[in-house]
Amino acid sequence: MAVDGQSNKRRKAERRGHAAEYWAALYLLLKGYRILAIRYRTRLGEIDLIARKKDLIAIIEVKARASGGSAVDAVGFHSQQRIRAAADLWLSRRRDAGRFSLRFDIVAVLPRRLPQHFIDAF
């Protein structure tokens, strides 16, 4: 029984995370970003969102949380390193990578509020 309960919790958390990623993507679209990838997976890790605005590439970690501050705290050093490695791999596959500046952001998706965008969070 415990395994089924954990499995249901995991599925529920995964659905909540996917919904948060789509809300964050919509919010960024409204802010003028173009979404290049959602849940970009590499052997080094996953990037929740990759967005572009002019000559800027934003690598975005999305967190569904009750408060924005806890979302920023939830992205620890190990997660940051994994995201950076995945971003480096993504960039290495682009011929035009040299013309972009790169930034790492966090978007906190909060209940009954607009998402909070933490620019250059790490």
Swiss-Prot record:
Transmembrane segments: none annotated. This is UPF0102 protein Atu0303. It comes from the Bacteria. One of its GO terms (molecular function) is nucleic acid binding. InterPro entries: Restrct_endonuc-II-like, tRNA_endonuc-like_dom_sf, UPF0102_YraN-like. It holds the Pfam family UPF0102. Belongs to the UPF0102 family. It comes from Agrobacterium fabrum (strain C58 / ATCC 33970).
